[in-house]
Amino acid sequence: PGLEDPSLTTEHERLAALAERHLWGHFSVLRNDVDGTRVIERGEGCYVWDAEGNRYLDRLAGLFVSQLGHGRPELARAAGDQAATLGFFPIWTYGHPSAIELSAKLAELSPGDLNRVFFTTGGSDAVESAWKLARQYFKLRGEPDRIKAVSRNLAYHGTTMGALSITGLESIKTVFEPLVPGAVKVPETNHYRCPTCQDEPHCSLHAADAIEEAILAEGPEPVAAVFLEPVQHAGSEVLHHHITSLHQLGENLLSLVVF
């Protein structure tokens, strides 16, 4: 339908029609028998409203920039003040007050000697950058063959080509194969489905041992990094003793550990 189609009697219908013609939604199903785009107009706290007035609990808020809730006036003021002062400037070989202050705050909140911050545009970009940095690190150390990355089945690390290669969800990967070579998969940390300890009261660390076995099976010379999700939304739980064990494993086998 055109923009002036008289059959489009509501703003919701007008926007939905425009979306059908021009908006290619992420993870959308491009079929004629699927209902049209639902138009989300506004948000407040943990809820969002569509153009027809229906309210929904926003269970996608953790994806990007609304973890603190919608409609926060102090956040809107801060964003407006920053845009009025300096809308954007790259931190290639420069710094600006907001980036400097935020990096210092993150270093203060981070444990141990994690005191340097490399900003990226989002999760996929962060994983891509971490894999590249791991490869560069070993190349500078005279070990250019260390290029592989170990990650878990069911783990979600992003949708760009490198991050998708490390991701362990086959349903979102197969249509893009072949992916970036060098991604090695190991079992997830799912105590309920673990073949060695699902009937035991305590975890046997089988999933941690599987990472060591995978690294040793690869060489371990070719392995640059192990990628882990301390908080998983797509796979299964990660237990604290797994993290402790894997940190020590990375030190023993000289592989980097990326959280």
Where are these regions (language model features)?
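Glycine-rich loop-to-alpha-helix module at the N-terminal edge of alpha/beta enzyme cores
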Residues: G2-D5, H12, R55-E143, V150
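Active-site-adjacent loop/helix segments that line or gate small-molecule/cofactor pockets in enzymes
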Residues: G2-E44, Y94, A99, A207
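Active-site and channel-lining beta-strand-loop segments
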Residues: T37-D58
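A short, flexible beta-alpha/helix-coil linker loop
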Residues: G62, T85-L86, N190-R193, P230-A234
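PLP-dependent aspartate aminotransferase-fold enzymes
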Residues: A104-A224
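Short acidic, glycine-rich surface-loop motifs adjacent to enzyme active sites
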Residues: E218-E237
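Catalytic PLP-binding core of fold-type I/II PLP enzymes
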Residues: P220, V238-F259
